[in-house]
Amino acid sequence: MAKNKDDEESYCGGGGYWDMVEDLEEEICFDAQEVIPNLYIGSISAATCTTSLKEHKITHILSISTNPPKIKEFTTLCINIEDESQKDISSYFQQCHGFIENGRKLGGILVHCSAGVSRSASVVISYLMSVFFKPFWYCMQYLRNIRPCIQPNTGFINQLINYEATILKNQNVISTTTTTTTTTTITKKKLISNDCNNDDNSSGGSGGGMES
């Protein structure tokens, strides 16, 4: 049996064995899943797997943590908040959404907290709600299908439910505005069409048109 690393390298035909082991360890530590294109959610361990982050073309890391890892070579944002029901995580939604959107455009982004269960899940759910205009429970279930362990704490859930009301209200405003704009456009087209018909009727039969 191999007694040390050198013996194992000789036994396995070179250093490729240890490269394989390191790659496997890296893959195991990358505790993250892709939610939608270029957006990942995971635990703090995923944020330290530099090789895996680069392989997934991740350029931005959003840490929802009071003790974020020190990460180089990536664009980072840290939201210093504890996983406690009374903490106001919703006040950070807009800032996080902007950072996520920018990260997705420039490459990819990982959103993480400590275990990838409560804080990061709350932020990702809020982002899905704002982008797709979907209710909280829909986005929660969608994310849980991808990462089964997620479970925002009770306080965060209440904040997300309140945020849902804002999202749906904004959707109604956009829908109303779009409907009004469409109606106005159709009305204008009808008026123009009627004007053209009136002009044709008033000049019809004169035979004064130019011919090529």
UniProtKB/Swiss-Prot annotation:
Its EC number is 3.1.3.16, 3.1.3.48. The active site is at C113 (phosphocysteine intermediate). It comes from the Eukaryota. The lineage of its organism: Eukaryota, Amoebozoa, Evosea, Eumycetozoa, Dictyostelia. PROSITE patterns: TYR_PHOSPHATASE_1, TYR_PHOSPHATASE_2, TYR_PHOSPHATASE_DUAL. Gene3D superfamilies: Protein tyrosine phosphatase superfamily. It catalyses: O-phospho-L-tyrosyl-[protein] + H2O = L-tyrosyl-[protein] + phosphate; O-phospho-L-seryl-[protein] + H2O = L-seryl-[protein] + phosphate; O-phospho-L-threonyl-[protein] + H2O = L-threonyl-[protein] + phosphate. This is Probable dual specificity protein phosphatase DDB_G0269404. Belongs to the protein-tyrosine phosphatase family. Non-receptor class dual specificity subfamily. GO terms for biological process: signal transduction. GO terms for molecular function: protein serine/threonine phosphatase activity; protein tyrosine phosphatase activity. One of its GO terms (cellular component) is cytosol. It comes from Dictyostelium discoideum (Social amoeba). SUPFAM superfamilies: (Phosphotyrosine protein) phosphatases II (SSF52799). Has a dual specificity toward Ser/Thr and Tyr-containing proteins.
